Amino acid sequence: MTYEIALNKAWDEIVALSPSQKHTVKFLTDIYEVQVIDRIVLMRPSDSPASEEISVLILRYLIGILKHGYNQKGEWISFKELKGGPSYYPAYQKNTIKPILKSLGEDPDSLIKNLTGRFGGKLVEGGDISVELVTFPDVHVKFIFWFADKELPPEVTILFDRELAEIFTTEEVATLMFFLAIAFLGNSVEGVLKFNLTSTIDIGL
């Protein structure tokens, strides 16, 4: 499914579900305004239109909240535990896990600094170091890192609450994790997407 088709479908669902004409959604450190009548997602305060890719993700989050709410189950799971997760894992590993591992091996200090400083993640127990990050409101993602040593390469495990599968499909979870990787590896999500680098992504909404 292309982003254009996914975007139109999401807007149709929002129009049918939403009791309000405007919604404000925070994603990482950015604020977005969803304007239902005009069918547009704007970044605040610049009023710049969000990319189709980010717009779809924000709308799918909003649809999930409107339909189900988001009540954490307190059960951390990995991507492979999602429905169809093992099938999507090779693309997920290529697009998200490998870039993180590359950064962890080359410059772990900057990686952790981005997560805890720029994005407000908090240090928690696990691995050599672990960071818990708020992505969308109440949607926490945990990154567990093991640093490289003389015998073993670096490793990372990404966990999230099982409730996330109630508002996002497996493909959407993969896309969320990809965007997180872009962001905390020091890139601009909107900037990368603007240059059509998502054509290399092996997942779709």
Question: What would you call each of these model-derived segments?
Answer:
Residues 150-205:
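Alpha-helical oligomerization segments
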